[in-house]
Amino acid sequence: MQFLHAHLLSVVIFFPMLSALLAFFMSDQASRAYAIVIALIELLLVLLLWHGFDIQTAGMQFEEMKELVYQIGVNYHVGVDGIALFLLLLNAIVVLLSVIYVKERRKDFAICLLLLEGILMGVFSSLNMIFFYAFWEISLLPVLYLIGRFGRNHKIYSGMKFFLYTFLASLCMLLGILYIGYDYANNYGMMSFDILDWYQLNFSSGVKTWLFVAFLIGIAVKIPLFPLHTWLPYAYSNAPTLGSVMLSALLSKMGTYALLRFLLPLFPELSEIYLTPIAIVALCMIIYGGFLAYTQKDLKTLIAYSSFSHMGVVVLGVFSFNVEGISGAVFMMFAHGIIVMGLFLLAGILEERTSSLEIARFGSIAKSAPVFAAFFMIVLMANVGMPLSIGFVGEFLSLLGFFATYPLLAIIAGTSIILSAVYMLTSYKDVFFGNLKAGNNQISVFEDLNAREVGVLSVILALILILGIYPKILLKPIEQGSKQLLEVIEIRSLPFLGSLDTKIKEVSYVNR
């Protein structure tokens, strides 16, 4: 127990990855039960982090540091704040529900999901940029395997487009990481890739700009930001159901997390200088993504563009530079992960029953599957930001925070979100209450949800409603992380490095 308490965060990172290796030696049937047990234990470990997290304490918590290759600044350094903590929780919840949902190819999915869970735990808690980048890149492999092995039409093309876009963009970020590591050595006489050390650096104006661009490109493709999103409809719609869940609920959050952890605190001045073009890009995501979703004939592609559109609201919250907006963005990242998981699982059930996702083929499903229709409606309403649902809270806070920064664009973004209600409710009407084409027997005898599907979706609905009615459970620790981030951004904006060193220690963000 003493070891677990001292190294809890490391256990959270490596336990699912090591457990995934053991699944190689199990049968298909046994691997599913095994994966459920491992994912449940992992969730309990994350809840231990939650229980031990002190919202009154500034700085990183559960911090662990081990020197590995000191000469080149490669150290194992992990820790969490109020922002990272909830992405760990989201990761644990999504993976547990996913392994429970798995219906076929259980062994392959169990291994990929557990591997990805551990890798993402590493992404959200790594404070050494070499480890962060390693986890960031390795996360591509399990998802690429799921798309290429179990995807729909054009799965190879979709997988390769996803891989090449994200891998090549990440190389830009790698160049920036290596440059800053060497720049730190020039300033302090030793190399460091520790993000908390980097907060002490001041970059020259010319170098600062290209470093900002290098990081932004690597991050933008992962979210993805417009116009670097063209891999998204292929990957999301052609991946198997759980592949789509991983991409939309978890991997997209890597990008917005990197904005908060790296881009804003390292380059606060440039983040403010380029606020207007970035905000316009986010607004394009909301409007353009909404119109594209409205025109889709395939339900899964519609959900993909809906996800893309909602991530635009998250980006606006991130660049609000105030507690309300950033807290709203983090809350919405969590909410979006839960909601979009529900939508893709429901779409997957529809595809399993009918071998199609073409909206025009459906109709009158509510008559034969009223429980399925009810679940779909509740998740759909959360997606459009219905009050008292989890989708409303993050969206409202993000736009409220951005309104204080850029009122006109916030108003346009707020009114544009009406689009999501239009395309979601229109597609719902067509699928569940539209006229059924004659001879379509698969739809007329549509089987309602089974016990396992009801169980998984009930957990999603409980989260949607409980956290929508009582969001304070999440918002308190998130607010703590947002305030710390803003303190670092403000300090990094000071003109003199001497003041910067002193102030960082005063707010205790560097917690040695």
Language-model-detected regions and their locations in the chain:
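Helix-coil boundary and interhelical linker segments in multi-pass alpha-helical membrane proteins
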Residues: 2-3, 121-129, 260-274, 314-331, ...
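Predominantly late transmembrane helices and immediately cytosolic-facing juxtamembrane segments
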Residues: 226, 340-344, 411-445
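Alpha-helical multi-pass transmembrane bundles of energy-transducing inner-membrane proteins
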Residues: 29, 111-115, 119-207, 292-305, ...
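Alpha-helical transmembrane segments of multipass membrane proteins
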Residues: 20-24, 96-99, 118-125, 145-146, ...
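Transmembrane helix-loop-helix hairpins at membrane boundaries of multipass inner-membrane proteins
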Residues: 1-8, 22-111, 194
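Structural signature of hydrophobic alpha-helical transmembrane segments
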Residues: 4-15, 80-91, 129-142, 208-221, ...
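Juxtamembrane/interfacial segments at transmembrane-helix boundaries in multi-pass membrane proteins
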Residues: 54-75, 171-229, 234, 259, ...
